Amino acid sequence: MAKETYVRTKPHVNIGTIGHVDHGKTTLTAAISKVLAEKQGVDATDFAEIDNAPEEKERGITINTSHIEYETEKRHYAHIDAPGHADYVKNMITGAAQMDGAILVVAATDGPMPQTREHILLARQVGVDYLVVFLNKTDLVDDEELVELVEMEVRELLSEYDFPGDDIPVLKGSALKALEGDPEQVKVIEELMDTVDSYIPEPARETDKPFLMPVEDVFTITGRGTVASGRVDRGVLTTGTEIEIVGLKDEVQKTTVTGIEMFRKTLEEAQAGDNIGALLRGVDRSNIERGQVLAKPGSIKTHKKFKAEVYVLTKEEGGRHTPFFTNYRPQFYFHTTDVTGVVELPAGVEMVMPGDQVTFEIELISPVAIEQGLKFTVREGGHTVGAGTVTDIED
């Protein structure tokens, strides 16, 4: 069967549901899908399909996630829901699903629970800056004051992690009742999605950001010069533009792109997502290597020392069998290459066990083009043992 073409008529936004286990994330996801589908007369994705999340591999890590899509009048959404807590942690840290915003689900019957806090912290660390709150299961709480108390607790918790707790929109309802078709609760879901439409801003398009391309390969074309190939990470590149070659060396080289090719055809302009070869003026083959990046001048710098939020794989996931300690020296895989680094654990953390999620400091042996929010994997002897996100640059 021929694949449907994706017609781009509305702005596209990636969102997800986060929150404690059994607070109703998947039920809410199914309810949103159903309510919006009925409004538009299309098929909904049902609970069982979402709950039975397929395994995906991202950076060598297996994650169960469900991606569903739906539309409001204003936007097209891709919605991600992960069944298990470990799946969420892995998802957010590896960037398997880059979320522009999220719906935080809190059961009014329980209030904020440990994973509620953990997901809020993760959202803060990996750059999910916009949250909308859905207080679920309010039909099971007789006392209105209790619901208000839970709302206050959630707002305080959000403020604690530098979210605007007082201003974040909070909606109250029952995802299950909405899924069963209760008209009053269907209205709440419609209201929730109107709020998501207006509160979670449209993401800056990748093409509007400064040009960046990690170098995957370098070769020479006789008589023409050196070509660096790779996938454009963000921004656009036009022939004749001045760029910088950044990373792995202390000094930055400037050069001009004299030609761009894609699939052996000449291209005037390359955009985010394109796999290209860029012909670089006056650059010797020995002066550029895999793992460096081509970038808009001044847009990215090299660093050696940074803090990161890291998920350490379990033995079952192919990770280490034993804990590691301060001064652990694995390889950190950034962009397209491994660089050795030394781990310094925070005060009070003696060791890190497989399966842990932890923040620590890393000092690399060579400078790499990095910035806040960059994803990387931790490797040892060619095997992935962890995945991380840069949270703070220290040098």
UniProtKB/Swiss-Prot annotation:
It comes from Leuconostoc mesenteroides subsp. mesenteroides (strain ATCC 8293 / DSM 20343 / BCRC 11652 / CCM 1803 / JCM 6124 / NCDO 523 / NBRC 100496 / NCIMB 8023 / NCTC 12954 / NRRL B-1118 / 37Y). Residues 10-204 form the tr-type G domain. Its main location: cytoplasm. GTP binds at residues 19-26, 81-85, 136-139. The gene is tuf. The keyword Magnesium applies. It is found in: Cytoplasm. Residues 174-176 are annotated as: G5. Disulfide bonds: none annotated. This is Elongation factor Tu. Residues 60-64 are annotated as: G2. GTP hydrolase that promotes the GTP-dependent binding of aminoacyl-tRNA to the A-site of ribosomes during protein biosynthesis. Monomer. It holds the Pfam family GTP_EFTU. The lineage of its organism: Bacteria, Bacillati, Bacillota, Bacilli, Lactobacillales.
